[in-house]
C-alpha cells in the first residue's frame, strides 16, 4: 500500500442558527438546565434552499480549491449522510457533476448513521493506496432531523466537510499513519422507511452505544499505533452533544487544549455525518507541520472509525485558500422557532 493522505479539504455550514432558549421556550422547558446537560447553546438550521447535496457541493468545491488539482483526476466520489435528499438518486453524482469530476469516475452514497463520512474516507484510502486511482473524494454531510419536542431538537443540525485523498508526497497536507474500526449490532438509534423522524433509546445511547464504541475504537487505534493520548497534539470525537464528547476525551486522557478545536457542538449542534469531518477541518485550520491528530467517529447501529494523522508543512500553504470553519461558525443569523419550523418543513397538515 502507498502512503496516502489528505491533499485538500473544505467545509460548509448554513448561516442560520436557533438558540436553545427559543426551542425550550416553545415547549415550556428549562433552557439553562438543557444547556448545562447537553453543553449545546445553539445549532445550525438549513435554509429552505439548502440540503445535504448543496452543503456537499460547497464543501467539495472548497476542498478542490485547497487541493489545486484537476477535478477530472478524481476517480471516486462518496457522500456519507443519513439525510440524502433523494431515496433514489445519488447525491454523489450531483456533487461530482457540480464540481466538474464526471463522467470518468465511480460514485456511491453511503449510510452508517453519523459515521458514513469517515467510512468514505477509509474507502478512498484503500482505492488510492492500492494504486487504482490518483485521487478520491469523501464527503460527510447532513441536515439532521429531530421530532418537534424531542430532545434531538436541541442538537440535530446541518453542515458538512469534504476531503480529497491522494498519494503524491509533495501534495499531502496531512498523512494517514493508520486507521482502525470497531463495529457491533447495537440498536440505539433508527428510522424506518416512510418515517419523518428517527427514534432513539434515550439513555441507552450512552454507555452501551456511544461510549462503548468510541472508547473501544480509540483504544484499538492506540494499541495498533502503540500510542497514548500524550502522543497527540489534537483530537476530535463524534459529538452528539458536548457532554459526551468531553467525557470521552477525558476518559482517554486528553486535555482541553487537545480537544478544544475539534469540539464544535456547543455552537453548531450535532451535524451527524458532518460532525467529525467538520471538527477535523477546524483542527487542520489551526494546525502546523508535524502536529499529530487523533480522530474517532461514531455511527449509531453501531460503529466507530479511528484515524491517526500527522500534518505536513504544506498545511500553511492551503488553509487561507478558502474560508475556514471558524469563519463559517462566526457568520450567522438567528431565527425564531416559528421560522425554524417553516425552514425544516415541520408544519404538516
From Swiss-Prot:
One of its GO terms (molecular function) is hydroxymethylglutaryl-CoA synthase activity. One of its GO terms (biological process) is isopentenyl diphosphate biosynthetic process, mevalonate pathway. It catalyses: acetoacetyl-CoA + acetyl-CoA + H2O = (3S)-3-hydroxy-3-methylglutaryl-CoA + CoA + H(+). SUPFAM superfamilies: Thiolase-like. The active site is at 82 (proton donor/acceptor), 114 (acyl-thioester intermediate), 238 (proton donor/acceptor). It holds the Pfam family ACP_syn_III_C. It is an enzyme of class 2 (transferase). (3S)-3-hydroxy-3-methylglutaryl-CoA binds at residues 30-31, 114, 155, 205, 238, 270, 300. Belongs to the thiolase-like superfamily. Archaeal HMG-CoA synthase family. HAMAP family: HMG_CoA_synth_arch. Catalyzes the condensation of acetyl-CoA with acetoacetyl-CoA to form 3-hydroxy-3-methylglutaryl-CoA (HMG-CoA). Functions in the mevalonate (MVA) pathway leading to isopentenyl diphosphate (IPP), a key precursor for the biosynthesis of isoprenoid compounds that are building blocks of archaeal membrane lipids. This is Hydroxymethylglutaryl-CoA synthase. It comes from Methanococcus maripaludis (strain C6 / ATCC BAA-1332).
